[in-house]
Every structure is written in structure tokens, then in C-alpha cells.
Amino acid sequence: MKADTPTDKASVLVVMGVSGSGKSTIAAMLAHRLHWLYEDGDWFHPKKNIEKMHHGEPLNDEDRWPWLHAIADWIDATRHSGNHGIVACSALKRSYRQILIGDRRDVRLVYLKGDQDLIERRVAARADHFMPPALLDSQFAALEEPTADERPITILVAPHPREIVETIVKKLNIDEPVGSSADRAPR
């Protein structure tokens, strides 16, 4: 992957965290607030990954590589089309984030950080998600919190989602929504 021209302005955000941290909710609300494109990383999972998780089996790295590369392709398509976008993706390990962000200086990481007890309660309350609460322990075990060199925007998940979104917008130093020229970038 070749390095891009450094910039402080994000063109794509990767909203990361364990299952139940609020990635999809926050990313969708943030995309609406900024008028940016939105994709949920779950939409990129091949059927076999979804079936595996539905049966309570944690994914391994071999399951994740094609999924991560599909998301990285969306990130590049969004950037190269001149749009701005947000993708919700667990991105638990540094090696996963390297695939998604790498040397792309205009792709920023938003880390939704939360206490395991709070997140367990959230996951237990969800009825319509393919990932069962039993897999949450494996997500926390796999989590490698982002380090300063990854330039994360770290946000605690306890506040109301609207408050979280406004905090992210302030930390990004975005005065006005940039907007996007399309509803969704090509996959």
C-alpha cells in the first residue's frame, strides 16, 4: 500500500470496538450528522462467517482476512470517488487496522471503549443480532486497544449516543457537514 499525502482532515472514519459497543448506532448517526456515506462492516461478512458466529463459533484470522480486505476496498473506493464515508467494524487487532487504515492518513480511527459489564448488558438485550453474547469474552480477549501512533479518537460508550456523536464531531474539528455526492460508494 502506498503512502498518501498526510492530512489532518478525515475522508473516512473506521468506528471500532467490541460487539455491543455501539459501532453501528454511532457510525450511522455520525454519517447522518455529517452527510457522509455509511457502511456496516457486518454487511461485508461472507455467509460462512455469519453462520459460524450464529452457531457460537468465534471467527479466526483466516475467516477475517477476506472480510477486512473487502472493507478496505470500500474505503479506497469511497476515498477515490471523492466522497467521505464511515464504516463500523470491530477492528479488534492492530493487524486488522493495518489492513483498513495502513498509510492512509485521511482515514481515522474512532475507538468506542467500554466496560465489559456494560457491554455484556447491551449484548444480552439485543434480540436481532447474529453474534451471541457468549462470544463477547473472545472479543475482549482479542482486543488490542489502539495506541497513540494509530491516532485514535477514543470515546467512552456510557453517554447517550447523541452526546457521543457530538463529541466525535468536535474532536474531528469539523465545522460544517462535508456531504457526499452519492448515497453509497461502490463496493
What are these regions (language model features)?
Residues 15:
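Hydrophobic anchor at the beta1->P-loop junction of P-loop NTPases
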Residues 28-70:
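Conserved substrate/cofactor phosphate-moiety recognition/catalytic segment
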Residues 23:
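Conserved lysine of the Walker
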Residues 1-11:
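Extreme N-terminal, non-catalytic leader segments
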Residues 18:
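P-loop (Walker A) phosphate-binding loop of NTP-binding proteins
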Residues 62-104, 112:
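Glycine-rich phosphate-binding loop used to anchor ATP phosphates in small-molecule kinases
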Residues 125-167:
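Small-molecule kinase domains that catalyze NTP-dependent phosphoryl transfer to phosphate-bearing small molecules
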Residues 103-123:
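Conserved phosphate-donor/acceptor-positioning beta-strand/loop module used by diverse small-molecule
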